[in-house]
Swiss-Prot record:
Name used for this protein in its record: Uncharacterized protein MG135 homolog
Subcellular location: Cell membrane
Key words of the record: Cell membrane, Membrane, Transmembrane, Transmembrane helix
Transmembrane segments: 6-26, 38-58, 84-104, 110-130, 153-173, 176-196, 236-256
Taxonomy, superkingdom: Bacteria
Family annotation (Pfam families): DUF5378
Gene Ontology CC: plasma membrane
InterPro entries attached to this UniProt entry: DUF5378 (IPR035319)
Membrane topology: Multi-pass membrane protein
Length: 285
């Protein structure tokens, strides 16, 4: 990791500390929802106008003139289809997650935040901190993005922090979240697989792991290197990465439900105390 890449770590840690530092005040003032709305609006607008609109209107923004994605070596038509239909999990969360926050759909927003947090985390710490950077590129890398990876860092950075804010500021988690994460994963991956089938042969990557190409590049490739797996064995990388991802998402769901577990314990103790009191009153009578 280059010295410049430590800036990614520093900014991310600083962002986390800011969220944690303001959480007690925000909860005390009971302005969680308004803060989440502002945060969600910033993420949505940044990603939509900094990235999404470029692929919706490629002729206007000049992306049609580029033959290939210089970073991932993916044909531009494939990249455009993936971006327009949100076939990658992180862009999906960045644009759809804020909508459910505005609609006050706490449970849906919470489930999306679990996936958004995990996806952003593995990209920030599994890929972006290893991206070769020149000093003159750092500002563009942080705020605009390099080549066809428009607002790549900022999208994952803001998604990571918004997800954390949802965990800390929202009260939309319950035990049923364990069921919802499986429903969402099944529904979203089925949607991606359907779109890949509809555009058969036209989409070659950026499909949240549906296509083998996804497992041979980016953060998944770095996972393979870290675990000393065969970097060309897509099936092995898929199996290991899927298992680790599933474990991480379930663990995240457990962690965000800690307040729920605490409340259940308190409720159980209150019920037990009430029964003891009732029994004592009956014996006195």
């Amino acid at each position: 990791m280059q010295s410049l890449n430590y800036l990614v770590v520093i900014l991310t840690v600083a962002g986390v500390l800011v969220i944690l530092g303001f959480t007690p005040l925000i909860r005390k003032l009971k302005i969680q929802f308004y803060c989440l709305q502002v945060f969600a609006a910033i993420l949505f607008l940044y990603v939509f106008f900094g990235r999404q609109i470029i692929y919706i209107f490629p002729d206007i923004y000049g992306t049609a003139a580029k033959a290939k994605n210089a970073v991932a070596n993916v044909p531009l038509d494939s990249l455009r289809l993936s971006r327009i239909f949100l076939l990658d999990l992180c862009p999906f969360f960045a644009l759809i997650g804020p909508i459910f926050i505005f609609l006050r759909q706490k449970k849906v927003a919470g489930v999306l935040a679990i996936f958004g947090f995990y996806g952003a985390a593995i990209t920030l710490f599994g890929e972006l901190i290893f991206t070769p950077l020149k000093q003159e590129e750092i500002v563009k890398f942080l705020f605009v993005g390099l080549e066809n990876n428009q607002v790549y860092f900022m999208m994952h950075f803001l998604s990571f922090l918004l997800s954390l804010a949802v965990f800390l500021w929202d009260d939309g988690f319950s035990l049923i979240s364990f069921f919802y994460i499986h429903v969402f994963a099944l529904a979203y991956l089925s949607y991606v697989a359907l779109m890949v089938n509809i555009f058969k042969g036209q989409i070659t990557g950026n499909t949240t792991g549906i296509l083998a190409e996804d497992w041979l590049s980016g953060e998944y490739k770095n996972v393979a290197v870290f675990l000393k797996l065969d970097p060309k064995n897509a099936d092995l990388i898929f199996g290991v990465s899927f298992g680790l991802s599933y474990f991480a998402i379930v663990l995240l769901t457990v962690l965000v439900n800690i307040p729920t577990f605490i409340q259940l314990t308190k409720d159980k103790q209150m019920v037990k105390l009430a029964l003891q009191l009732k029994k004592a009153q009956a014996s006195v009578a």
